[in-house]
Curated annotation (Swiss-Prot):
GO terms for molecular function: glycosyltransferase activity. Keywords: Cytoplasm, Glycosyltransferase, Lipopolysaccharide biosynthesis, Transferase. Its EC number is 2.-.-.-. This is Lipooligosaccharide biosynthesis protein LpsA. GO terms for biological process: lipopolysaccharide biosynthetic process. Belongs to the glycosyltransferase 25 family. The lineage of its organism: Bacteria, Pseudomonadati, Pseudomonadota, Gammaproteobacteria, Pasteurellales. The gene is lpsA. It is found in: Cytoplasm. Involved in the biosynthesis of a moiety on the core of the lipopolysaccharide molecule.
Length: 263
């Protein structure tokens, strides 16, 4: 098992949580010291990533580079698989067996282990594999979050070769933008094997400055987009049409899509 948990060296409370969480199922792992904002220029240059024109916050860039660093580690060590986690996750049942990776179909780039309650997926996606009462199916639509995933050797090679600029968050890249590429294969595990603390618990145990920064950036970008929309001709007509279509869209989502649970 090549299990790595990205964590700031200063995040002792989170590290204790991970030690306890992985310890419950006797799962071996290593902490990977997260890249900090003061190092992003140095690390981006080392990985040949252009961050000169990005709107991302320094925290978002540091997060992305921490993941990219592990992709490079996997490639350098020629690992068949690497399991990458963030330090605020909880693991589901049978995690020890499911992290062995010997069940993963060929030509897979990533197996996404995590779920978020924001993005719906097609309930009729073809199942590629059943394992311990869970199924793996090809992810064809947006389902973001990088708190838990298995990256294959092929996947590491693919992502390192294609990612040259950071203009959007890392999870939007690998679990949305790149899904448009035909040969890129991401499998989603359902029910999911891990979930972040802020999803599982109504009272968040681990405050995240990264989530706060991202929320502020997104709100600012939304304001700019909304102002631009108001200036467009036929804006109000388009808005009325969208509102009329909304009930049909909601019905379609209810029939054809679903959320991924955590178990």
């Amino acid at each position: 098992m090549n299990n790595y948990v990205i964590s700031l060296t200063s995040a002792q409370e989170r590290r204790k949580h991970i030690e306890a969480e992985f310890g419950k199922q006797n799962i071996p792992f290593q902490f990977f010291d997260a890249i900090t904002p003061d190092l992003i220029k140095e690390k981006a240059k080392a990985f040949n990533i252009d961050i000169s024109n990005t709107n991302l916050t320094k925290g978002e860039i540091a997060c992305a580079l921490s993941h990219i660093a592990l992709w490079h580690l996997a490639k350098q060590q020629n690992l068949d698989y690497i399991c990458i986690f963030e330090d605020d996750i909880y693991l589901g049942n049978n995690a020890f067996e499911l992290l062995k990776t010997n069940y993963i179909p060929e030509n897979t780039h990533i197996v996404k282990l995590e779920t978020l309650p924001f993005d719906r997926i097609n309930r009729f996606n073809k199942t590629e594999k059943y394992i311990l009462n869970r199924r793996l199916f090809k992810l064809n639509s947006r389902h973001v979050g990088t708190a838990g995933y298995i990256l294959t050797n092929k996947g590491a090679e693919f992502l390192i070769n294609i990612l040259k600029t950071l203009n959007i968050p890392i999870d939007d890249l690998i679990f949305d933008e790149y899904l448009k590429i035909k040969e890129y294969k991401v499998l989603q595990m359902s029910p999911a094997l891990c979930v972040q603390d802020f999803i599982l618990n109504s009272k968040t145990n681990f405050k995240s400055s990264l989530q706060d920064d991202r929320a502020i950036r997104c709100n600012n970008e939304d304001k700019i987009k909304n102002q631009a929309k108001l200036k467009k001709p036929n804006y109000f007509l388009t808005k009325i049409q969208k509102e009329l279509y909304r009930p049909f869209k909601q019905l379609k989502q209810k029939v054809f899509t679903t959320y991924i649970t955590f178990k």
